[in-house]
Amino acid sequence: IEKATLDNESFLDIDGAKWFVEHHVRGVGFDMQAIDHILYTYAADHGPGPYVPRICEEYEEQFGHPAKDDFPEWEPCHDILMANNVMGIENLGGDLDKVTNQRFLFCAFPLRWYMGDGTIVRAVAFVPSDRIDRSVPDKEYPYGVY
């Protein structure tokens, strides 16, 4: 299926999730809102959705058929990763570019949530100070500005 909205730099696709499982990855983190493409979530026509009906309308207007034809499942990447005990961490943010392409100790401290399967975490990378790429500018977050 050709999906003009597919961009592997912006979201994880089903083949990518399977690749993580096949390569025995234990956890994967993302600096984005969700592991799955937004049209695989309840923002579109899945689960209790759509909570953003305009994205379904815009997709159909642009491609001539409902988004659900191309994105039929609800959060398939979540399902693949969770079913195989691969931890997925979304919304990492921060200065990730300063520590990419190197090994470091990563810890995620979750809220205690009895019987929960997901929660926010305090994500921490322990990196020796001499290995931080100081040529990368600090990330700034202008909260409240759109």
Label every model-predicted segment.
Residues 1-146:
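Active-/binding-site microenvironments in catalytic and ligand-binding cores
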